Each structure stands twice: as structure tokens, then as C-alpha cells.
Design a protein with these regions (language model features):
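Active-site donor/metal-binding and catalytic loop motifs
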Residues: 183-204, 208
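Glycine-rich, basic loop-to-helix element that forms the pyrophosphate-binding segment
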Residues: 40-54
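Conserved donor NDP-sugar-binding/catalytic core segment of glycosyltransferases
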Residues: 40, 72-113
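Conserved small/polar residues in nucleotide/adenosyl-binding loops
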Residues: 220-222
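N-proximal low-complexity "stem/linker" segments adjacent to membrane-targeting elements
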Residues: 1-31
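A short, conserved alpha-helix in the catalytic core of glycosyltransferases
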Residues: 77, 139-155, 160-188
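Short aromatic/hydrophobic "clamp" motif used to bind/position activated sugar donors
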Residues: 59
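A recurrent flexible, glycine/aromatic-enriched loop bordering the glycosyltransferase active site
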Residues: 123-148
Length: 222
């Protein structure tokens, strides 16, 4: 298999962004699934629909506000999974210790590197050194760019979580607890046109997540 599926949930499909994504992944036979969602469905629902529609083993979930620095992404992503068959989920940033629903709470446990754009400012958040060709095992990854091998994971997105928050933590944690490796790579460079947002909906999901997994949180570390 030399193609992958890319899934993006967005309020309104922007053809310029679609073209940027296609150019960055650099494979005309990839499957691109852009789903318009004004909030009628949770991100967990939309992403599970993407998995259901996918015709490839590897499914990449992306935010709709990314600027890709790395090009020709498709073969790079396939190579990551081919060389690391024990991994089912790979991202660009994460943590190897989880003590609450705020995964970035322990700065010293964070791994990976992600670029950000905030107004006119463009910078890279280096949570750790580069790993080169290696993958660093973590417990949780940030969902801005999630690569999933659907035949290796044992759990899909948890639809008990509503809205646009906490779609990433439960799927990573459940798979980690079931022996599926979750990892971070520094081989892919991009910029996120957002610095994240924690609002009342985020807090509601955070408390729900912590209630569900309270017995695991203090024990989860690699």
C-alpha cells in the first residue's frame, strides 16, 4: 500500500487549504476526506466516520489551520509505520507521563516539536530535542496531527466526549493501556495557526476524562 487517507473536519471547506494539503502530501491517489462540520457533530464522531470511509490502512487526522513545512509527506508517513510495526498511533508532540487531563502539565515529560503562528509571530515550540529517524514512545499525543494505523489500534475515538476537545487523549490512553504503542516523531515540520484554547467546554471534558481514568492517571508514565 503506497497511499494513505487524510481526514480533516472544518466549518467550511477552503479550496486553498485543500490544495495546500494535497501539495504537501504529494500523492494524487491519496484519499482526501474533508468534512464540513459546524458543530452538529463532535470531532470524535466525525473522525470515526473518517475511519469508516477510509480505504487505506494509514489514516492521518489534521486540523484545518496547519501550514506544512515538510513536503512529500506520504512516503515519509508510510515509512514511519513500516519501520515501526509496533506503533499504532504517531504524532508530533506528546507526553510520556499523564497526571491529569491537561497533558502538557508536566513540562519535563513533554516530547516533540511543533511550530506555531500567533499573529505575525512564527516560532517553534521545542518540547524536546530532535529524535532523528527514531520514534519516542509516549502515552498521549496532541491531536493537531494524528497518524493512525487502523489495523493496529484496538480502540477508535471515544464518542462520549462532545464538541471539539478531548478527541485525542482517550483514544491514545485506551490504546496505550491495551498494549498499542503511541509515539512522537520529529521528522515532520509544520506550523499550527493556533496556540490552543481552554474554555468551559474543554474544562467539562477534562473533568469527565479525569473521572473516567482517575485510577490510571498517577500510574501512567513511560
Amino acid at each position: 500500500m503506497n497511499t494513505i487517507t487524510i481526514v480533516c473536519s472544518t466549518r467550511k471547506i477552503d479550496e486553498n487549504y485543500v490544495n495546500h494539503v494535497k501539495k504537501s502530501f504529494s500523492h494524487p491517489k491519496n484519499q482526501y476526506i474533508f468534512i464540513e462540520n459546524n458543530g452538529d457533530k463532535s470531532l470524535t464522531q466525525v473522525y470515526n466516520e473518517g475511519i469508516g470511509q477510509s480505504t487505506n490502512d494509514i489514516v492521518v487526522f489534521i486540523h484545518d489551520d496547519l501550514e506544512f513545512e515538510t513536503k512529500n509527506l506520504t512516503p515519509k508517513i508510510i515509512k514511519l509505520f513500516d519501520k515501526n510495526p509496533e506503533y499504532g498511533i504517531i504524532g508530533l508532540a506528546g507526553t510520556n507521563s499523564l497526571i491529569s487531563g491537561q497533558w502538557w502539565e508536566k513540562r519535563e515529560s513533554m516530547q516533540g516539536q511543533v511550530g506555531h503562528i500567533n499573529g505575525n509571530k512564527k516560532y517553534i515550540s521545542k518540547y524536546s530535542d530532535s529524535f532523528g529517524d527514531k520514534i519516542k514512545e509516549v502515552v498521549i499525543i496532541d491531536g493537531l496531527f494524528m497518524m493512525i494505523h487502523k489495523n493496529r489500534v484496538k480502540h477508535n475515538f471515544d464518542t462520549r466526549f462532545e464538541g471539539f476537545h478531548f478527541y485525542d487523549l482517550p483514544i491514545c490512553l485506551l490504546n496505550h493501556l491495551d498494549g498499542v504503542k503511541v509515539g512522537v516523531t520529529t521528522k515532520i515540520k509544520l506550523y499550527h495557526k493556533s496556540i490552543g484554547m481552554t474554555d468551559k467546554k474543554w474544562l467539562k471534558n477534562k473533568l469527565f476524562f479525569e473521572a473516567l481514568y482517575e485510577k490510571h492517571l498517577s500510574l501512567i508514565h513511560i
